[in-house]
Amino acid sequence: MKSLRLLAVGKLKTPFWQQAAAHYLERLRHTWRVTETLVRDGDAALPPAKRNADEGARLLAALGPADIVVCMDERGKAYTSREFAALLDRLTENATAVPCFVIGGAYGLDDAVLKRATLRVCLGPMTFPHEMARVVLLEQLYRADCILRRSPYHH
């Protein structure tokens, strides 16, 4: 069974995002070892740059030296679902390195985290709330798994 990590800022607070994330995590865990690591949100009273830096420091501390860091970033490369599946397949060829998909908080990812990235991926040209972005990423990971297994989920 291949492994992947999801590293994100904060817990999902909205019940329907919690349910959607749990749904895709459950499906993914049938064929993948998925580790979800959440770091604490930055203090909302702080200016956005300071909040981002604090969250970034926590994200960096949670990364392992062998992690293949894939940052979800609006300036990243956009992939079709099939291209993303092929990328996931390539990222998991080496059993000693684990792809770690990183999602920032309300203000995205700090530059220090982006500098640690092996790869930056864009979910699309539109901006999503970070809770929605997490669910979209989980769905796309599940879809990629189905594409790789030739499951009928993706038409």
UniProtKB/Swiss-Prot annotation:
SUPFAM superfamilies: alpha/beta knot. Its EC number is 2.1.1.177. S-adenosyl-L-methionine binds at G104, L123, G124, P125, M126, T127, F128. GO terms for molecular function: rRNA (pseudouridine-N3-)-methyltransferase activity. Its main location: cytoplasm. It is found in: Cytoplasm. CDD domains: RlmH-like. Signal peptide: none annotated. Keywords: Cytoplasm, Methyltransferase, rRNA processing, S-adenosyl-L-methionine, Transferase. Gene3D superfamilies: 3.40.1280.10. It catalyses: pseudouridine(1915) in 23S rRNA + S-adenosyl-L-methionine = N(3)-methylpseudouridine(1915) in 23S rRNA + S-adenosyl-L-homocysteine + H(+). The keyword NAD does not apply. Specifically methylates the pseudouridine at position 1915 (m3Psi1915) in 23S rRNA. Belongs to the RNA methyltransferase RlmH family. Homodimer. This is Ribosomal RNA large subunit methyltransferase H. It comes from Nitratidesulfovibrio vulgaris (strain DSM 19637 / Miyazaki F) (Desulfovibrio vulgaris). The gene is rlmH.
